């Protein structure tokens, strides 16, 4: 696997060193004991098997030319079918690749598979193309230069493309070129029966698990702004990204717009946002209420979308004119998820089988890392999510729902401002002080995870170490990815495009170098063979689907919308 080392970034102009509100490391005398961690979460025990957290990673990346231009070519056939390859597909655009790992208990296995997908892909791209390693896109010429993803001639493939056409007509193509990382998380099956017993719950295990994942989601919403501060890596963008749109960004140079204290513009008004959804209150207190909220949005026509109409030849330009074409159009920092059966709608699967895992959607690509994420960040995410699951999580009401959204926006735009104030239950609270308090509480979750991930019976240190890295970012904002990027742009006189292209080339070389060095290893050959077989089989699977009798698409679409 690729080995990455942390190094201190150049100190940004707004680099801060907190005094009275500085967060403390949790590595030595300040580290919570195992007993105090159990007491903090009101647990009788934390079994060894409970630490077998299961995670998977989905990563999006644009295909670009060696000069940083968005690829205009179709999805490479050597990567298989975008419809049926479970590991390599496309998101909105033909040029926006999406890599999907399997779910693993071992972090190293998950990242190893992600690295293998990268290496397999890079050795099969044409025209010396590479992957853009930043969340904000490369310089864009215009909407016509962003090809919508194609999934073949079957009705299900046409539906996937039509959904993307709908997104294009509703929000524009440019917004959809933003890339991110989705982190899928679940607790091991062995955890739930014993935890249910500890909680004194006498209902069904399915309902208990579902309610506890909703419990996690509510806490995640309350504190997701902290992840945006710590891992946000989109403080600036090319001017082409906002061409013709209103914005409040400042000019950094001839080609770059930014905000001085911004962390993650991807999660702000320029990113995955929908004006139509701003007033939508989606409740996470109860699965039925959550499903009802989304179901209503998927069956309520929206006048602005009705006005889109049909194409010049009468062809549909979106799946329907409802507020949401389908479940995935609802923009959120986290989603309750369940693996679906063939032909099953996600909401129907959730209502039938309950929540199986959660999907974190608030993470930028880190352009300083070859994979956009590393083991240390993964350990912190596990710590954060375990804390969200075990800590108290009151039910959310409408006022808090919109307060949480406002807090997120403030951190997106001003997160590195040392004077930033947020709102907690209607009262102002300093962001730095609040973040220090949360990080302090996370020490208990780190202790639990380290207690079962040590070697030879010794207490581990990896989760506490990952937490301490984030504490350092709070105490010095120049250590955050956003602070590091702006400092490098300012110190070296680089535009966002120049910095992102430079970093993309560096990571491209690192990944290809690691691939060449691993050529003779059994693991590399096994990966190569596996991805090759999957790609070939996926093309055959798509051909088989397309050879089956198909309804005419209009009839298929009408039946799908009526379901």
Regions found by a protein language model. Name each.
Residues 2, 12, 16-168, 175-179, ...:
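Terminal catalytic/cofactor-binding subdomain
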Residues 72-75, 111, 144-145, 195-196, ...:
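Short conserved micro-motifs at the rims of enzyme active sites and ligand-binding pockets
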Residues 53, 155, 159, 175-179, ...:
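Secondary-structure capping and boundary motifs in well-ordered enzyme cores
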Residues 158-170, 177, 186-350, 370, ...:
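Loop-rich catalytic cores of soluble enzymes, especially ATP-dependent carboxylate-amine ligases
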Residues 351-352, 358-449:
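Substrate-recognition/cap regions that form aromatic- and gly/pro-loop-enriched pockets
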């Amino acid at each position: 696997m690729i080995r990455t080392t942390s190094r201190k970034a150049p100190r940004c102009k707004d680099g801060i060193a907190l005094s009275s509100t500085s967060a403390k490391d949790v590595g030595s005398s300040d580290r919570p004991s195992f007993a105090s961690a159990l007491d903090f979460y009101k647990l009788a025990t934390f079994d060894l098997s409970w630490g077998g957290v299961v995670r998977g990673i989905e990563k999006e990346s644009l295909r670009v030319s060696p000069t940083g231009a968005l690829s205009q070519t179709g999805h490479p056939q050597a990567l298989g079918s975008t419809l049926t390859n479970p590991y390599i597909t496309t998101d909105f655009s033909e040029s926006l690749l999406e890599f999907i790992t399997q779910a693993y208990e071992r972090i190293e296995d998950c990242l190893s598979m992600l690295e293998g997908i990268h290496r397999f892909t890079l050795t099969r791209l044409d025209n010396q193309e590479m992957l853009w390693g930043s969340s904000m896109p490369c310089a864009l010429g215009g909407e016509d230069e962003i090809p919508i993803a194609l999934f073949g001639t079957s009705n299900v493939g046409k539906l996937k493309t039509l959904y993307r056409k709908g997104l294009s007509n509703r929000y524009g193509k440019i917004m959809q070129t933003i890339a991110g990382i989705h982190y899928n998380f679940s607790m091991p099956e062995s955890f739930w029966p014993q935890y249910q017993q500890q909680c004194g719950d006498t209902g069904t295990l399915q309902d208990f698990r579902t309610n506890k994942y909703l419990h996690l989601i509510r806490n995640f919403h309350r504190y997701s702004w902290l992840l945006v501060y710590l891992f946000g890596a989109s403080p600036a963008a090319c001017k082409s990204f906002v061409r013709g749109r209103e914005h409040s960004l400042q000019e950094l140079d001839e080609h770059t717009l930014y905000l001085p204290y911004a962390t993650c513009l991807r999660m702000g008004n320029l990113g995955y946002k929908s004006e139509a959804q701003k007033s939508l209150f989606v409740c996470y207190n109860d699965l039925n209420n959550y499903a009802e909220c989304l179901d209503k949005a998927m069956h309520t026509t929206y006048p602005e979308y009705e006005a889109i109409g049909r194409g010049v030849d009468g062809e549909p330009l979106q799946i329907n004119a409802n507020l949401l074409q389908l479940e995935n159009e609802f923009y959120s920092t986290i989603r309750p998820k369940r693996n679906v059966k063939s032909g099953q709608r996600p909401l129907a699967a959730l209502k039938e089988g309950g929540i199986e895992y959660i999907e974190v959607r608030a993470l930028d690509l880190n352009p300083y890392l070859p994979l956009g994420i590393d083991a240390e960040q993964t350990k912190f995410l596990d710590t954060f999510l375990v804390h969200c699951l075990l800590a108290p999580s009151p039910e959310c009401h409408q006022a808090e729902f919109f307060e949480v959204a406002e807090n997120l926006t403030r951190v997106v735009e001003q997160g590195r401002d040392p004077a930033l104030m947020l709102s907690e239950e209607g009262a102002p609270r300093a962001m730095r002080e609040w973040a220090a308090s949360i990080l302090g509480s996370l020490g208990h979750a780190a202790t639990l995870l380290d207690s079962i991930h040590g070697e030879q019976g010794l207490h581990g240190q990896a989760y506490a170490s990952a937490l301490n890295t984030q504490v350092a970012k709070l105490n010095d904002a120049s250590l955050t990815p956003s602070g590091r990027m702006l400092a490098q742009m300012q110190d070296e006189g680089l535009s966002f495009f120049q910095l992102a292209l430079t970093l993309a080339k560096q990571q491209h070389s690192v990944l290809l170098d690691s691939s060449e060095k691993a050529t003779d290893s059994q693991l590399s050959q096994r990966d190569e063979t596996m991805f090759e077989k999957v790609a070939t089989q996926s093309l055959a699977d798509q051909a088989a689907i397309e050879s089956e009798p198909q309804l005419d698409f209009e009839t298929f679409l009408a039946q799908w919308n009526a379901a």
